[in-house]
């Protein structure tokens, strides 16, 4: 016998292009949609960075000698390489046309998350403090709507040992980031000893299927009826400590 157990809804929303000069906040914009209790709102990091005016014009960047030399190896503009270096704590690896860095947030990713996609001009770093941004957006939405919600800021990142980019959570508020299930029982009554679920990453990846990574124009996704814990989480709790990382 087959029976339904869980039905989760994923709703992609088109919004006006964000420039950073709007007379409304992201919370005010998102609240115009009829949200429901325990909706999870996933927002593309591009929208958050642009709304926070975190875009750097190329003519304001003075590349260092290091950036100029690296740009020759990578086939990238020196200005772009300079921003990548500025946004990083350290360089982890050099690829053929990318740099794997640890960002100032602690993320290990290509090019410090810096890109020029879906930005009409300038270079766009990641939001300065994604958890803080997610929290401010969530609190704004809850104040306006009276509904309890979760907010995730997502970005697409490549993965070591697997091809293809995938959505990940870089900022989290109002929903669990890392779901610790140790001590629970499996179907046969055995106690789970090590299970920790990167639930915010799973939600971010789910939203990315609808958002797309090209010209879809869907930077906002509502996930409804998600079977996840609604407790205060962060994106930082998903970052593996350097001393626990066996691949670095």
From Swiss-Prot:
Mind listing the UniProt keywords for this protein, alphabetically? GTP-binding, Ligase, Magnesium, Manganese, Metal-binding, Nucleotide-binding, Potassium
Task: Give the enzyme's EC designation.
Answer: 6.3.2.31, 6.3.2.34
> What does the record give as the function of this protein?
Catalyzes the GTP-dependent successive addition of two or more gamma-linked L-glutamates to the L-lactyl phosphodiester of 7,8-didemethyl-8-hydroxy-5-deazariboflavin (F420-0) to form coenzyme F420-0-glutamyl-glutamate (F420-2) or polyglutamated F420 derivatives.
The entry's free-text remark on the cofactor is: Binds 2 divalent metal cations per subunit. The ions could be magnesium and/or manganese.
Q: Does the keyword Nucleotide-binding apply?
A: yes
Required co-factor(s) are: Mg(2+); Mn(2+); K(+)
What residues bind GTP, as annotated?
15-18, 45-46, 50, 118, 211-218
> Tell me, what is one Gene Ontology molecular-function annotation carried by this entry?
coenzyme F420-1:gamma-L-glutamate ligase activity
Entry annotated with the keyword Heme = no
What name goes with this protein?
A: Coenzyme F420:L-glutamate ligase
Which parts of the sequence bind a divalent metal cation 2? 156, 213
Q: What does the record give as its pathway?
A: Cofactor biosynthesis; coenzyme F420 biosynthesis
Binding partners and assembly: Homodimer.
Q: Which reaction does it catalyse?
A: oxidized coenzyme F420-0 + GTP + L-glutamate = oxidized coenzyme F420-1 + GDP + phosphate + H(+); oxidized coenzyme F420-1 + GTP + L-glutamate = oxidized coenzyme F420-2 + GDP + phosphate + H(+)
Q: Which organism is it from?
A: Methanococcus maripaludis (strain C6 / ATCC BAA-1332)
Which GO terms of type biological process are on file?
A: F420-0 metabolic process
Binding residues annotated for a divalent metal cation 1, in chain numbering: 115, 155
Query: What family is this protein classified in?
Result: Belongs to the CofE family.
Top EC group: ligase
